[in-house]
Amino acid sequence: MTYIVSLFLLGLVLGLVAVASNPAPYFAALGLVVAAGVGCGVLVGYGGSFLSLVLFLIYLGGMLVVFAYSAALAAEPFPESWGDRSVLGYVVVYTVGVMLVAGWFWSGWYETSWVVVDEFKEFSVLRGDTSGVALMYSYGGGMLIVCAWVLLLTLFVVLELTRGLSRGALRAV
């Protein structure tokens, strides 16, 4: 299980490097999907199965709509891919930077951070992430509604910002 979690962590770092190094919205959105997927895998490895499911469904269901609109409105005829020279330079710089930072902090966190949830499953009586579901829907119901409204407002703000010189998605007919 430790090898799978470390593979997910490597995929998370590569996905974030793909997001940070690419100026084209198509490939950056693909990097975000990869980073979200393997990030949810890391959460599952550390025992947050419900949290990772909620994160994955909300992220892919809600935020990819915004990415689809942004990519459609900022369409380029020849987008820069990961094989282009400028983007490849950023990929190399970010990867070397991550390796240097990991090498700098290697001895401090390596011994204690690789404990996954399967190694202590004999000691766990309840699931910590599922016990918060009732609180989220009872006491946190108002905040859940506020978050839904904020996501809707974010969608309209992104549509308004990416409309360019045209009249936008909301226009009088």
Swiss-Prot record:
<keyword id="KW-0813">Transport</keyword>
<keyword id="KW-1278">Translocase</keyword>
<keyword id="KW-0249">Electron transport</keyword>
<dbReference type="GO" id="GO:0008137">
    <property type="term" value="F:NADH dehydrogenase (ubiquinone) activity"/>
</dbReference>
<feature type="transmembrane region" description="Helical">
    <location>
        <begin position="53"/>
        <end position="73"/>
    </location>
</feature>
<keyword id="KW-0496">Mitochondrion</keyword>
<keyword id="KW-0830">Ubiquinone</keyword>
<comment type="function">
    <text>Core subunit of the mitochondrial membrane respiratory chain NADH dehydrogenase (Complex I) that is believed to belong to the minimal assembly required for catalysis. Complex I functions in the transfer of electrons from NADH to the respiratory chain. The immediate electron acceptor for the enzyme is believed to be ubiquinone.</text>
</comment>
<comment type="similarity">
    <text>Belongs to the complex I subunit 6 family.</text>
</comment>
<feature type="transmembrane region" description="Helical">
    <location>
        <begin position="139"/>
        <end position="159"/>
    </location>
</feature>
<keyword id="KW-0679">Respiratory chain</keyword>
<dbReference type="InterPro" id="IPR042106">
    <property type="entry name" value="Nuo/plastoQ_OxRdtase_6_NuoJ"/>
</dbReference>
<dbReference type="Pfam" id="PF00499">
    <property type="entry name" value="Oxidored_q3"/>
</dbReference>
<dbReference type="InterPro" id="IPR050269">
    <property type="entry name" value="ComplexI_Subunit6"/>
</dbReference>
<dbReference type="InterPro" id="IPR001457">
    <property type="entry name" value="NADH_UbQ/plastoQ_OxRdtase_su6"/>
</dbReference>
<feature type="transmembrane region" description="Helical">
    <location>
        <begin position="86"/>
        <end position="106"/>
    </location>
</feature>
<feature type="transmembrane region" description="Helical">
    <location>
        <begin position="27"/>
        <end position="47"/>
    </location>
</feature>
<feature type="transmembrane region" description="Helical">
    <location>
        <begin position="1"/>
        <end position="21"/>
    </location>
</feature>
<protein>
    <recommendedName>
        <fullName>NADH-ubiquinone oxidoreductase chain 6</fullName>
        <ecNumber>7.1.1.2</ecNumber>
    </recommendedName>
</protein>
<dbReference type="GO" id="GO:0031966">
    <property type="term" value="C:mitochondrial membrane"/>
</dbReference>
<keyword id="KW-0812">Transmembrane</keyword>
<keyword id="KW-0472">Membrane</keyword>
<keyword id="KW-1133">Transmembrane helix</keyword>
<keyword id="KW-0520">NAD</keyword>
